[in-house]
Amino acid sequence: MLNIDLQYFAQLQDAAGRAHEIRTTSAPTAADLYDELRDVYSFALEPACMRVAINAAFSPWEQPLRDGDHVVVIPPVTGG
């Protein structure tokens, strides 16, 4: 099991009801972690319309996760 430091913004933060959490997971990749989070928080956004950053660097969704990683899922910017 991995302990992942997660940060949420915009509509993801609203859906999760928090901006930050430490989550214990067995997800091997960022994509698998997002699938897990979608099940928990009913996130509506598809990964294809967002970016993921792992340890302050943009990363592919298939990036393997390591214990202690800081993961930020960045939704599209909206507003006017």
Where are these regions (language model features)?
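Ubiquitin-like/PB1-type beta-grasp interaction modules and other compact soluble beta-rich domains
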Residues: 1-79
